[in-house]
Amino acid sequence: SDIEAARNKLVAEGIDIGNFIEGEGKDEDSGEIRTWKNLFLPFSLTRGLFTFLIQHEDGCIPSHKDKFDAAVTRLDHVVINTNDPEGIISLYGDTFGIRLALDQTVEQWGGRMLFFRLNHTTLEVIAKKNDEQPEDSLWGLAWVVTDIKKTYDRLISEGLEVTDVKEGRKPNTLVATVKSNTCNIPTLLIQHL
């Protein structure tokens, strides 16, 4: 399986990695069981970021089609801060085999920006070099929604604090920021037009 191949690759590179953890979940509405395997990666490898690999084995994630237009459909991008851009290129590009799609300096966004692509998700890295110990940290998450206005209305009706919908930085997008109930992780909703 893919997760076993990933574990074998890391072990072959001399990385001390644990064993798989089996998971199981039950859909309370349908009674359907779904199973998966997790492989937690050590902080010494991930440079302080809580990271694990997951492979779904059986069953499927429930689809709530009645609320689909007002729900998150997938993860769009993860924003990571680093003080060691070359180290993160080595980790994500060489060790994990994730494609570095773009490496550019954008002064108005804070410096060097790295964009890794994994399926339909982007790992956006904001690099600000300093002389401290290499460290990475999660800065934020961006979630794709089908209809941002319906999602906004649903979240507001459920008591969450959400900014008004506006045009995104990326052309042909609408965005809103979830300001509450995010465990202090900056959280963006994005609709691609």
Locate each region found by the language model.
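A short beta-turn/loop motif at secondary-structure boundaries
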Residues: 106-108, 131-133, 168-170
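Exposed loop/turn and edge beta-strand positions of beta-sandwich/beta-sheet ligand-binding modules
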Residues: 110, 137, 172
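Short, conserved charged micro-motifs
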Residues: 2-9, 86, 148-153
